């Protein structure tokens, strides 16, 4: 009987700290996995860069063989100034065979979750929210945000850095092809405003805008915040409450997001909005995304960690989003293993490393 393999890559995790927590009985599931499979401290490849190590893990080859030495590389015959920085984890740079290519040659399926190696040359390989596609562009159309609505002045702020932006707030994006911004449109209705989230979808040449109509009613012992689009609406009535998922049809697919009421008084309302993804734009093949939305649920990014480290979001909300993401990954793996008969699943879990990368920006 053929076995199925799941490789869990905990980016930024310390083996010594994991071992300590396992010994203290605080990581029962990790301990169980270690007892059923294998777990060992890895020796990093030289040079010890992110793309170098992920390529080594994925191929079993050393950097001298696979050719991925750092962020960017130089290919034979090209000018010295050619860097290929954005393509450091793409297969055209790697000269060794990936393990999923070997699996594909045997007629079996593989799935890569937030992993390197797209676009692949092999059949039978699924990609979900892949790392470092061309132009360094992630497939979420809008990162998570925290909003402060001043009910007295009708002024809204959108948190980004340690100081909130006012009016129109341009969101920082890594890609050169995706423009994302949010704008508050003042309504004639009392205590009603529209949050307009606009974005351009990478490689699709599609520019979209989602407008959330916001109505807030606050009294001494009662609070109601309604958010609606032309196709969906939610209402929040208690502090700490999460909304149901909002599913918003667009010409690129179905967008999804949810909201949480952080605080509410007669002066202001604070809201958190999860990241926005479109069902057909975070997986390959695209139809896999629709299946995952139906059987697993909407996908979210890891970027709330940046808001948490900057003090813009509370620890409880951060942990709730992290738990949702972990539950989603577990359900996704089970779905791929059973419904799609995937033999190899490779996961790159980035939450810990996302927090570590965010620390310098908080300090400086």
Identify the residue ranges that each predicted region occupies:
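Beta-strand elements within well-structured catalytic alpha/beta cores of enzymes
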Residues: 2-19, 33, 57, 103, ...
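Short phosphate-engaging motifs
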Residues: 14, 29, 95, 99
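His/Asp/Glu-rich, glycine-adjacent segments
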Residues: 62-364
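Generic detector of short, locally flexible boundary/turn motifs and exposed helical patches
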Residues: 6-7, 19-24, 35-36, 75-77, ...
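Short, structured active-site-proximal loop/turn typified by the sulfatase FGly-forming signature C/S-X-P-X-R
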Residues: 18-65, 109-111
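Short, mixed-charge, low-aromatic patches
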Residues: 9-15, 52-59, 284-292
């Amino acid at each position: 009987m053929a076995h199925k393999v799941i490789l869990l890559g905990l980016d930024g995790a310390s083996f010594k700290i994991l071992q300590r927590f396992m010994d203290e009985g605080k990581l029962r599931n990790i301990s169980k996995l270690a007892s059923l499979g294998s777990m060992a401290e890895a020796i990093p490849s030289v040079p010890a860069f992110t793309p170098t190590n992920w390529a080594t893990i994925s191929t079993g080859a050393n950097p001298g063989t696979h050719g991925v030495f750092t962020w960017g590389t130089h290919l034979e015959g090209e000018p010295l100034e050619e860097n290929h920085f954005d393509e450091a984890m793409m297969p055209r740079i790697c000269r060794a065979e990936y393990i999923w290519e070997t699996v594909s040659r045997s007629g079996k399926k593989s799935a890569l979750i937030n992993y390197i190696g797209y676009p692949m040359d092999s059949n039978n390989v699924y990609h979900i929210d892949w790392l470092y596609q061309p132009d360094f562009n992630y497939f979420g159309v809008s990162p998570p945000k925290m909003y402060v609505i001043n009910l007295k002045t009708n002024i809204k702020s959108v948190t980004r850095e340690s100081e909130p932006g006012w009016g129109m707030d341009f969101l920082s994006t890594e890609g050169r092809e995706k423009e994302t911004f949010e704008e508050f449109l003042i309504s004639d209705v009392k205590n009603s405003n529209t949050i307009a989230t606009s974005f351009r979808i990478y490689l699709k040449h599609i520019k979209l805008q989602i407008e959330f109509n916001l109505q807030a009613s606050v009294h001494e012992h009662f609070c109601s915040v309604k958010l609606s689009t032309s196709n969906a609406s939610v209402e929040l009535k208690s502090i700490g409450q999460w909304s149901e998922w909002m599913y918003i049809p667009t010409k690129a697919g179905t967008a999804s997001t949810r909201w949480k009421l952080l605080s509410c008084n007669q002066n202001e309302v604070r809201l958190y909005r999860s990241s926005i993804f479109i069902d057909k734009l975070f997986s390959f093949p695209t139809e896999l995304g629709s299946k995952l939305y139906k059987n697993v649920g909407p996908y979210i990014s890891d970027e709330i960690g940046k808001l948490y480290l900057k003090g813009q979001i509370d620890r409880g909300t951060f942990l709730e989003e992290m738990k949702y993401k972990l539950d989603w990954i577990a359900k996704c793996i089970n779905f791929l293993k059973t419904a799609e008969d995937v033999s190899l699943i490779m996961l790159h879990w980035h939450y810990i490393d996302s927090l570590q990368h965010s620390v310098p920006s908080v300090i400086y």
